[in-house]
Amino acid sequence: MAQYIFFSGKGGVGKTTMAATTAVYQSGKGKRTLLVSTDPAGNLGDIFEREVGVEPVNVSTNLTVAQMDSDAITEAYKNRMLEPLSAILDEFALAQVKEEFNGGCTVEIATFDKFTDFLGDNTYDLIVFDTAPTGHTLRLMTLPNEWDKYIKKSSEGSGQTCIGPVSQIEGARKKYEHAVQVMQDASQTKVFLVSRPEKTSVYETFRARTELEKTGIHNFHLIINGVYPNHGTTSGIFGKLAENQKAYINELRSKFPVDTSEVPMQQSEIKGVNNIALLGDITFEKKMAKIQNNFAQSKPFQEFAPASALMDLLVKKGNSRIVILTGKGGVGKTVTACSVAIKLAEKGKTLLFTTDPAAHIGQVLETEVNHIPVQVNENLWAVNIDQKEAVEEYRQKILNDAKANGYTAELIAALAEELESPCTEEIAIFEQFANLLNNPEWDYFVLDTAPTGHTLRLLELPFEYKNQIDMKAKEGANTAVNANTGLVNTKIENLINRLKNTDEAAFLLVAYPEFTPLHEGFRAMKDLERVGINAQGVFLNNILDEKDCTDDFSKERWKLQQHYLNQAKEIYRSKALFAIPLQSSEIIGIKQVKVLSGLIFN
């Protein structure tokens, strides 16, 4: 019987590295191991330094790895579902069904369906799942229950679901029911929660455990990653950071008295099977060793753009300006968004908001932030798109519109049933996103997004949604849905045009100077270009000052940064690069955010 390990945690805490480390370590003990990334922006290929795709590929003895590609998986799922229908439907009806399958709902269910396939695979002794950051991990791990309930409920009603007739997917329901049982079985499944000893990461770890316990999952192991070496002094920037970490390490250990591992920060990044294996020995065998880099000494990087160029990108040129920050999890998007918003509030009324399910704006600003805008500073408000509130508001809006447009009671009941689909959440969040950006009250919008893969998904939704509405319009004027098609289509068209217009929207990537965040940022930039959006600049975070690097550890980290800063110049050839200096304390509270904002913009 296969064993399963899930890795979860805030973006950027090192989930992928620790998942890879665990998989390499266990395979070295003789276990036939499969490592799977369910993260839309997964970077297993970067870590193993080879191509990793949907089909499992062998990377070392007893170890194969795979990356779930949502596009390929969705296409395969659609073909599988449509094949039996093509024999019984006419050409027009089949075209309509195909269009239904082009929605975001299909992407989620197809990816999830593939995930549950792994939970029934006994080819391996151990399957390790490297998941997306916490909010999306929780989404993935609660979906088996949600889909199981939804299909059961639909079978008792219309017999239809948003992904086809119940009769066609009844087998899937049984598979999802089995997935729930496997994930709740402590003898088969364990969740490794990865945390950094920092405020937002610790909060996220405790939240994840609480939410997972609600789903019947209780078997956890804690990894405290990125622990700075103890220099025995508080001098130097890393010495001060190490002191800051101690209280958080104690807090984590008090809440996880057993099954806890501490992983020291290394001088170099972790890439390649040999380094991953060494980190496994350091983590699980307490081996005293260091992973070192071979970067040569170089002159300090001098190619950062001035603050005046940053302000030119951000200041509005018309009635309002949308500033969207995106990048890999853990690169500092939230702190950067708060710092940018503080500055723009000097220029006009500013709304700072997030679409990240694991929203951290409130923790950074030390202010309670919810789905209603709250003032956090002069001219600055903050709001969090709350998933539950968004879904409920969206459902009520659709049902009220249906009643106003003369739907029969039978049609309204069918519509209400369809709105129970777990897919409703994605489009509801997009609705809130669009409504906020269409509010003329604000001079500036600053959007702190979820990590890259989910940001790209959000930004693709307007384009998909518009295509679906166009299809509805072609079905004819007799449908009540068509009554609002023109208005909705215009609204979406306007939003698409605003996001593409560099006079109205500024997209900036956030990264720090290491291989994975730089290359993930580059991939995100290319994906944005695919939908007609051009990133206009790159924030490079946690930049070390050479004079702060007084010991071997910090000197090696500085050399690593110089190497990748020069690489960033090559990767983002035409983009302005903006520096955010590493601070010796966490950026928590308005006062600290203002200090960092001053350093960025002066």
Labelled PLM ranges:
Residues 1-4:
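Extreme N-terminal starter segment of soluble prokaryotic enzymes
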Residues 6-68, 122, 131, 141-145, ...:
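Walker A/P-loop NTP-binding active-site region of P-loop NTPases
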Residues 35, 126, 221, 352, ...:
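Hydrophobic "anchor" residues on beta-strands that sit immediately upstream
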Residues 42-46, 73-77, 135-139, 202-203, ...:
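Switch/connector loops and helix/strand junctions flanking conserved nucleotide-binding motifs
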Residues 42-106, 359-420, 424:
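P-loop NTPase motor core
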Residues 51-52, 82, 207-213, 339-341, ...:
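Short, solvent-exposed amphipathic alpha-helical segments in soluble enzyme
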Residues 86-194, 198-207, 405-510, 520-523:
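Phosphate/Mg2+-binding loops and adjacent switch elements
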Residues 180, 184-323, 496-505, 511-602:
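C-terminal lobe/tail of nucleotide-utilizing enzymes
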